[in-house]
């Protein structure tokens, strides 16, 4: 049974898998509506273990790389470090204390652990969510408002925001150690067991608390992230259109003449008519350098376009994964707050276990989409762990691609940067 009833996938409690009733003032399991099939515990253990190992490994690597590599201590990476710590905390304090009691049908860790784990679970979920919001706002400022955001995009400001986030989360979740207690009950085999449950004094307070968590940990953060990443995607899309217009304008001003002997109005006609010998010498002297410059420009433009499209796709993945991981558990807890009996009948046992597992998945996908998908972080990882195989030095195309990929998360994708690059670009 879900004996750790107050264990947080999202800072709330989880229904038990059997319907509880009172007999002689003692809680008993009246029935077992969903008898677990033989394969379900094995699958549950396998999936929980896999998510646990991936989360611990991924977040530990992120923390190690960002702490040991001083060159990577940027404003964004400071937020990513805080996110990795909170995700690691979520994994360590949530998964074992949910899986083990679920399998044993008894919370065997005692009252002190019940209060401590529920408190740290709620705090880790809150910090993780607030960090995701802070990262989205920081990226919005860097890309869409680069000039205005320079004032507050400093390491000291990031550290203040992170400290405030942790203090606020610890404060918000103080009801958990106060109202989390062990509740004894009698199982169907007449053995006495315990549940770790978070129970407020009355139904109104319980419903208000769940509604409060639904707002501050899911709906409001989700809306903020959607708006921020939507505006960033719009900015990048406008940049893609700007690049296309610039490329078309450059082709119109600089038509190719290598494959045709006819000359129309333009530089080609002028170069053939005025002082042909000198022009030929100048062309011969300038051809290698100008050809290389044109190739670099073309490669840079292509890499920049591809990098912007990758960022847009990644932002969409971030928003989709946030809602996919957290919507089921928040919906389940809100349902249980307002209709306890119906929710416990339909969600008890295996359904709620896998809903919780889905929420825990966020702790292992965050390091992947925020860090390991970033080329600079991968290079920092290789620099931190020199024992790992290192790829050969990239060619000019790879260097340009790396530079442009890094720029997609900075201020160079702003409107100011587009106009600045356009004004300062050399003429054809």
Swiss-Prot record:
Lipidation (S-palmitoyl cysteine): 387
Highest taxon in the source lineage: Eukaryota
Bilayer topology: Multi-pass membrane protein
PROSITE patterns on file: G_PROTEIN_RECEP_F1_1, G_PROTEIN_RECEP_F1_2
One Gene Ontology term from the biological process aspect of the record: cellular response to hormone stimulus
Molecular-function GO term, any one: cholecystokinin receptor activity
Cysteines paired by S-S bonds: 18-29, 114-196
Glycosylation sites: 10, 24, 190
Region (Disordered): 250-269, 393-428
Cytoplasmic side: 68-77, 138-157, 235-313, 374-428
Bias-annotated ranges (Polar residues): 409-422
InterPro entries per record: Cholcskin_rcpt (IPR009126), Cholcy_rcpt_A (IPR000596), CholecystokininA_recpt_N (IPR015276), CholecystokininA_recpt_N_sf (IPR036472), GPCR_Rhodpsn (IPR000276), GPCR_Rhodpsn_7TM (IPR017452)
Primary location group: membrane
Residue intervals passing through the bilayer: 42-67, 78-104, 116-137, 158-178, 211-234, 314-334, 350-373
Extracellular face of the membrane: 1-41, 105-115, 179-210, 335-349
Keyword terms of this UniProt record: Cell membrane, Disulfide bond, G-protein coupled receptor, Glycoprotein, Lipoprotein, Membrane, Palmitate, Receptor, Transducer, Transmembrane, Transmembrane helix
Pfam family, one: CholecysA-Rec_N
Record function comment: Receptor for cholecystokinin. Mediates pancreatic growth and enzyme secretion, smooth muscle contraction of the gall bladder and stomach. Has a 1000-fold higher affinity for CCK rather than for gastrin. It modulates feeding and dopamine-induced behavior in the central and peripheral nervous system. This receptor mediates its action by association with G proteins that activate a phosphatidylinositol-calcium second messenger system.
PANTHER family with a match to the protein in the record: CHOLECYSTOKININ RECEPTOR TYPE A, G-PROTEIN COUPLED RECEPTOR
Family: Belongs to the G-protein coupled receptor 1 family.
Name of the protein this chain belongs to: Cholecystokinin receptor type A
Gene expressing this chain: CCKAR
